[in-house]
From Swiss-Prot:
One cellular component term from this protein's GO annotations in UniProt: cytoplasm
GO biological process, one term: translational elongation
Record InterPro entries: EF-Ts_dimer_sf (IPR036402), Transl_elong_EFTs/EF1B (IPR001816), Transl_elong_EFTs/EF1B_dimer (IPR014039), Transl_elong_Ts_CS (IPR018101), UBA-like_sf (IPR009060)
Pfam family, one: EF_TS
Source superkingdom: Bacteria
Organism: Mycoplasma genitalium (strain ATCC 33530 / DSM 19775 / NCTC 10195 / G37)
HAMAP family per the UniProt record, alphabetical: EF_Ts
Alphabetically ordered keywords of this record: Cytoplasm, Elongation factor, Protein biosynthesis
Record Gene3D superfamilies: 1.10.286.20, DNA helicase RuvA subunit, C-terminal domain, Elongation factor Ts, dimerisation domain
GO MF term list: translation elongation factor activity
Protein name: Elongation factor Ts
Gene responsible for this protein: tsf
Annotated function: Associates with the EF-Tu.GDP complex and induces the exchange of GDP to GTP. It remains bound to the aminoacyl-tRNA.EF-Tu.GTP complex up to the GTP hydrolysis stage on the ribosome.
Region (Involved in Mg(2+) ion dislocation from EF-Tu): 79-82
Amino acid sequence: MATKIELIKELRKSTQASVMDCKQALEKNNDDFEKAVKWLRENGIVKSTKKLNKVASEGIIVLKSNLHKAIMVEINSQTDFVAKNQELKEFSDLMLEKIFEKVNPKTELVEIEKIQINNDEKVSEKLALIASKTDEKIVLRRVVVFETKTNQIFTYLHANKRIGVIIEIQGKLNEDDGKHLAMHIAANSPQFIDQSDVNQTWLQNERNIIRSQAELEVKENPKKAIFLEKTIEGRVNKLLIDTCLINQKYLIDETKTIGQFLKEKQAKVLKFIRYEVGEGIIKETVDFVSEVNAQIKQ
């Protein structure tokens, strides 16, 4: 468990809010990190979700695909140094090679861990061996498999192996267009394909936060009261533009939206997924002095 001081540090790093605001947010929410972030947003201290960069654990994204199938796995380690370890890289390449034909969209991590990859050695056993050599915890965190007989699959893995994307497309895109679309998703982090795909619970939660922020502004300037509902709707619409893929300006050609690009190509995005190393994980931090003292006492 992270200490109160560590939670304040992580909350401040994630939201850019002041130390006192972070302390107050945690106190009002029983040290619940996610609720504290929400409280900061509702009270206008953090205005935009784009500023909420979660503290990431280390690791790599690994990916293998052809036109009709793709698998993406996140492997977590405790340090960036181990994430770049040559043996871990060789293991991940071998693992993908051995498991690619054996997995399907219903495959779970526990099944992958049991697959033999080399001389009767299971994935879990090889990971444990690398972990013992590096003296770090190394785990498979999550996996996703796309598979289709009639549609196209495109992927993108960023050079640093920290971001990966898989898309399933209905229609015909050439290889460059498919890769560029995957790159766009990697760079712009859409959450939904279009408004019909939006999670309504999420949208209502965001609308409530936007309303709280707007009402605070009205308290500061009562003249804004007559524009309250229009302000809220405008901000909700902007949020939908930012988070829905087809509404976003196309990274490769900003004169058109993704929706316009797909219409020109007579193609449709059926689904996509974007992985980023450590997203959603709160990493515990230990200061250098404490770490040295702990080692001395061992």
